[in-house]
Structure formats: C-alpha cells, structure tokens
C-alpha cells in the first residue's frame, strides 16, 4: 500500500514532464532540495548572489552559468556537504540537477568540484563586500514591516594557523 502524503506546495513541471515524488525509487536521498528549489524560485537569493559576482571567465569556455554554480554550491551545503570534496559525485545526482534547473535524467552534469572551488576563491575583498551587501539587500526585501527581526551574528575570532588561504 502506498502512502500518498500531499505536499505543501505544487511541484513544477520539469523538462515538460509532471514531477512526482516517490519514496521507493532509491535514486537520491536529497528530497529536501525540492523545497530549496521552490524557495529559491520565490526569493531569488542565489540569483541575486550570482548577479553580484563578476564573471571573469573566458566567454568561449563557459559551460555553467554563474547562477547554476552558486545554486549547486548552496544545494550541496544544504544537504550537509560543507566542503567541496563531494561535488564531483553530487554533480550527477538527479535532485541536485533538478535544484539547479537541469533535467534530472538527461541534463548535463553540474559544475565540477574544481570549477566550484575556483568560484569560491575568486572574489576579491571588494567583491566579497558586494556579496554581503546583496545578502543584506535580500534580507531587507523579505522583512515585513512591523515585525521584530533578530540577526544573530557570531563574531567569535577563530585563529587560523599556518599558511591557510585568506587567513588573517
């Protein structure tokens, strides 16, 4: 007997096909990415970050849009993959591809670990400040007037030892 629990949102069509959820397929364990995808469609946080990042890549060699790279990285972090070493495996995951906007079965693989790592290390200090400003702007557009919002920012100093990149 199948248990059909209604979802709290409608699933969009994917590659002109109706999307259904089945917990017996054993294709991916990243079902929460459907929620993340819908939130991104509603809020556009990853799109805003991608637009704030300068793209210094050679236009003739670009295979992945900046938004796709940012969204793939955010999706990986949301699934518990904080560092980038799992991204070469995740780039073929059907739900990761779906979260980024690619066809799960037939769409091209997502950006590789090295591509995403280059993106993470590319911003200069002024560009990092622009990314922070984009997040603050995003926060400002989502706050409802008259509500109390608390930003809990951890300012704990964490010393980095050795010659670590971007260490103080």
What spans do the regions from the language model cover?
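Dynamic "connector" segments at or just before major functional cores
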Residues: 1-168
